[in-house]
A protein has these predicted regions:
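Small beta-strand-rich domains/subdomains or short beta-sheet motifs embedded
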Residues: 14, 48, 66, 72-76
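Acidic, low-complexity mobile loops and tails
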Residues: 1-61, 94, 98-106, 110-134
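Short histidine
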Residues: 62-64, 71, 91-93
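Short, well-structured beta-strand-loop connectors
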Residues: 51-65, 76, 81-84
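Residue-level recognition of beta-strand microenvironments
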Residues: 22-24, 68, 85-88
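Charged, amphipathic alpha-helical coiled-coil/dimerization segments
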Residues: 79, 83-84, 90-97
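Short glycine-rich, polar/acidic loop-and-turn segments at beta strand-coil junctions
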Residues: 35-37, 69, 78
Length: 134
């Protein structure tokens, strides 16, 4: 496992307390699992993503990730409609381990309120939570 200081936290992203990240891309938001979360899970062997067109409320489960250690649920950091899913994750779930902020993204959503992204944690605030053991 990585030490907290080794965790990658891109400054341009926003983070949820549940260890998901959000990147605004125009009027859409790309969502994935943080480097910290993938590191804690260990080798990821299966990912279940939602259906395109599904509307998922903030805080609701949007994906399930299975690793050699455990099965974990991922919680939607902002309400919106799923407009795309990362299909290659189904065949190659280790992408979540190898590239959590790149090829390992999970869903692309059209947020109900794009301004809600500003309510999520900055990289600095997320790191502070991690150091606090949350």
């Amino acid at each position: 496992m990585k030490r907290i200081e080794e965790i990658q936290l891109p400054e341009e992203l926003r983070y949820s307390p549940d260890h998901e990240w959000v990147r605004l891309e125009g009027d859409l938001a790309r969502v994935g699992l943080t480097d910290y979360a993938q590191d804690q899970l260990g080798d990821i062997v299966y990912v279940e993503l939602p259906s395109i067109g599904a509307h998922i409320a903030q805080g609701a489960v949007f994906a399930t990730v299975e690793s050699v250690k455990s099965v974990s649920e991922c919680f939607m950091p902002l309400s919106g409609e799923v407009v795309a899913v990362n299909g290659p994750l189904s065949d190659n779930p280790v992408l979540l381990n190898q590239s959590p902020y790149g090829d390992g993204w999970m869903v692309l959503v059209k947020p109900d309120d794009p301004a809600a992204v500003s309510q999520l944690l900055t990289a600095e605030a997320y790191l502070t939570r991690l150091k606090g053991g949350v």
